[in-house]
Amino acid sequence: MQITFLGTSSGVPTRSRNVSSVALRLPQRAELWLFDCGEGTQHQIMRSELKISQLSRIFITHMHGDHIFGLMGLLATCGLAGNVERIDIYGPPGLNDYIQSASRYSYTHFSYPIKVHAIRPGVIYEDDYFTVSCGNLHHRITAFGYRVAEKDRTGRFDVEKAKALDIPSGRIYGQLKRGETVILDDGRVIDGTQLCGPTEIGRKIAYCTDTIYCDGAVELAHDADVLIHEATFAHQDADMAFQRLHSTTTMAAQTALAAGAHRLIMSHFSPRYAPGNTLELKDLLKEARAIFPRTDMAYDFMIHEVPRRREVELTKVGV
């Protein structure tokens, strides 16, 4: 799983940062999921190594413009490219009306199916490999955070051990690789889990923006390998954060700490902390790391690989 940050500024773009969008690349299935779609997102995708043709799902947190103004342009481009089979879009009530109205008034007709899902807290998508859920955040308008949880899978199959037990290859190997119990022709009962390595723990990613510190974000980020959390303001500007219902760096760090997350990546920074100002982004990073040391600061086109965890590794660190 690979995370690419396409936009890391809050409210408005700057020369070095576009507005909100994060891409999740799933190489094992040549699929791309997008979280928020601020103005200019399609340009950011084109400047990256991502492929628009692989886009299959878009998750919108809320209906503020810096999170949705790039959506119609991206969808129109997907149609003109002609190589997108279908896109499912998930978001708050009103998202479908927005897309339909923009399409009608701009005379935009899509050459591929688009399905808009009005979400409510809970599981919103599930397949054999992933579960995606959402939860309420605390912002000025209805806002949702997302959690992508990869399902655990059986560890690596020990072919040599299977051969040593004179287990015939073929269909039976497939069953054993899945951890199933198989009865051989000679009557032996083989437990597939005994021929597989440690269970590969599914990776978990949480995406929480826009919000002030809230229990909903903590729940979504529980045991997350990566928590992507907004950090619009520095701690000294907490009054503005409470007024506008955005997070400070310390709120983001406290969320990661309370959730037991393994890594925090902050994003959605106010342009007021540009280089040369009294407070700069490097100062915001220090604030967060004082509370949660495993904190990084996102920048446009930053790529973060999410490694797998194994039960043995978790036992060693006492998780």
From Swiss-Prot:
<keyword id="KW-0540">Nuclease</keyword>
<dbReference type="Pfam" id="PF00753">
    <property type="entry name" value="Lactamase_B"/>
</dbReference>
<feature type="active site" description="Proton acceptor">
    <location>
        <position position="66"/>
    </location>
</feature>
<dbReference type="InterPro" id="IPR036866">
    <property type="entry name" value="RibonucZ/Hydroxyglut_hydro"/>
</dbReference>
<keyword id="KW-0255">Endonuclease</keyword>
<comment type="function">
    <text>Zinc phosphodiesterase, which displays some tRNA 3'-processing endonuclease activity. Probably involved in tRNA maturation, by removing a 3'-trailer from precursor tRNA.</text>
</comment>
<comment type="subunit">
    <text>Homodimer.</text>
</comment>
<feature type="binding site">
    <location>
        <position position="210"/>
    </location>
    <ligand>
        <name>Zn(2+) 2</name>
    </ligand>
</feature>
<feature type="binding site">
    <location>
        <position position="66"/>
    </location>
    <ligand>
        <name>Zn(2+) 2</name>
    </ligand>
</feature>
<keyword id="KW-0479">Metal-binding</keyword>
<feature type="binding site">
    <location>
        <position position="139"/>
    </location>
    <ligand>
        <name>Zn(2+) 1</name>
    </ligand>
</feature>
<dbReference type="Pfam" id="PF12706">
    <property type="entry name" value="Lactamase_B_2"/>
</dbReference>
<dbReference type="InterPro" id="IPR001279">
    <property type="entry name" value="Metallo-B-lactamas"/>
</dbReference>
<keyword id="KW-0378">Hydrolase</keyword>
<protein>
    <recommendedName>
        <fullName>Ribonuclease Z</fullName>
        <ecNumber>3.1.26.11</ecNumber>
    </recommendedName>
</protein>
<dbReference type="InterPro" id="IPR013471">
    <property type="entry name" value="RNase_Z/BN"/>
</dbReference>
<comment type="similarity">
    <text>Belongs to the RNase Z family.</text>
</comment>
<keyword id="KW-0862">Zinc</keyword>
<feature type="binding site">
    <location>
        <position position="210"/>
    </location>
    <ligand>
        <name>Zn(2+) 1</name>
    </ligand>
</feature>
<feature type="binding site">
    <location>
        <position position="268"/>
    </location>
    <ligand>
        <name>Zn(2+) 2</name>
    </ligand>
</feature>
<dbReference type="GO" id="GO:0008270">
    <property type="term" value="F:zinc ion binding"/>
</dbReference>
<feature type="binding site">
    <location>
        <position position="64"/>
    </location>
    <ligand>
        <name>Zn(2+) 1</name>
    </ligand>
</feature>
<dbReference type="GO" id="GO:0042781">
    <property type="term" value="F:3'-tRNA processing endoribonuclease activity"/>
</dbReference>
<keyword id="KW-0819">tRNA processing</keyword>
<feature type="binding site">
    <location>
        <position position="67"/>
    </location>
    <ligand>
        <name>Zn(2+) 2</name>
    </ligand>
</feature>
<feature type="binding site">
    <location>
        <position position="62"/>
    </location>
    <ligand>
        <name>Zn(2+) 1</name>
    </ligand>
</feature>
